[in-house]
């Protein structure tokens, strides 16, 4: 992910340089009518500036709703950002985000629709390529197509020193004890609230799988205490009740 982001930043710097070169060329073209040239460039810059400000405000609102675990409102914001992008290839990051949010709400049909609209080409930004294949692999994994998920991950995603959630699931599918070790290792490193909850939920499921119901209950409770329409949070609430009833019977 870090390498993909670094490459994307480099591409953005290249685009900025191209923009500056074009601006300079426009000034040369309008050299004899300098005031007209400056006026045209000023108008272009003002339009771009206000476009970026509006885009940034909507983007921040979208991220705020993700932090608040209100994905329905975040989806509304993402759709606005999606409509603002006029170039099809620039819409892909919003298609990926929409797909991920719909999947977390257990709306598989919508999730797959947006993911299928993404077109990967040699012009695709590295961070978009990374996010697409990660989301595609996750979709395959959680729909029971684990071999396909493994193949997508191995062929398209470079392994990093810090394993992500999907990589841990794929590597330790048949070794829940080691899966717990790896999940516990990455949990303190999580900065994003939603991803941290996903790791806690994975720990709850894995602890339940190995029969450590006390630890499973501990993590299920941490997830279940959040108020959200996210599907795994709803399931965690049900699991807390289920394990509580089991404990009473014992």
Positions of predicted regions on the chain:
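Alpha-helical segment of the N-proximal tetratricopeptide repeat
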Residues: 56-87, 93-105, 120
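Transmembrane alpha-helices and immediately adjacent membrane-cytoplasm interface residues
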Residues: 37-67
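Alpha-helical repeat scaffolds
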Residues: 73-81, 108-120, 145-157, 177-191, ...
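Alpha-helical adaptor scaffolds
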Residues: 100-106, 129-138, 142-143, 151-192, ...
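Long, non-transmembrane cytosolic or organellar matrix-exposed soluble domains/tails
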Residues: 187-250
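Juxtamembrane interface helix immediately N-terminal to a transmembrane segment
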Residues: 1-14
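Structural signature of alpha-solenoid helical repeat scaffolds
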Residues: 49-50, 82, 86, 123-126, ...
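"A position-specific structural signal for the A-helix of alpha-solenoid helical repeats
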Residues: 60, 90-97, 128-135, 162-170, ...
